[in-house]
Amino acid sequence: MKAIALLEVQAMVAAITGLDAMVKAADVRLIHVEKRLGGRLVTVVVEGEVSAVRAALEAGAAAAAEVGKVKCCEVIARPHPDVMAFLTA
């Protein structure tokens, strides 16, 4: 079963640190990065199996929180095709 994890952080350094932890912690793949406010608000999206995505998000949020502020994070299991189209457009 596929899932996505969204990690929204304040600051690019926190996003990179969180993403690094996510891809090292589990078998997930980066599918989207969105930068807002000149990189002061960054959302990282990864995909993989549900258990891998959950483990990755836990590790990524913890790592990002050490160097910045985590605004929001969420796992979406079996995202609708329209959600995936929105993310990859």
Task: Set out the residue ranges of the language-model regions.
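Long, contiguous binding/interaction regions
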Residues: 1-40, 45-89
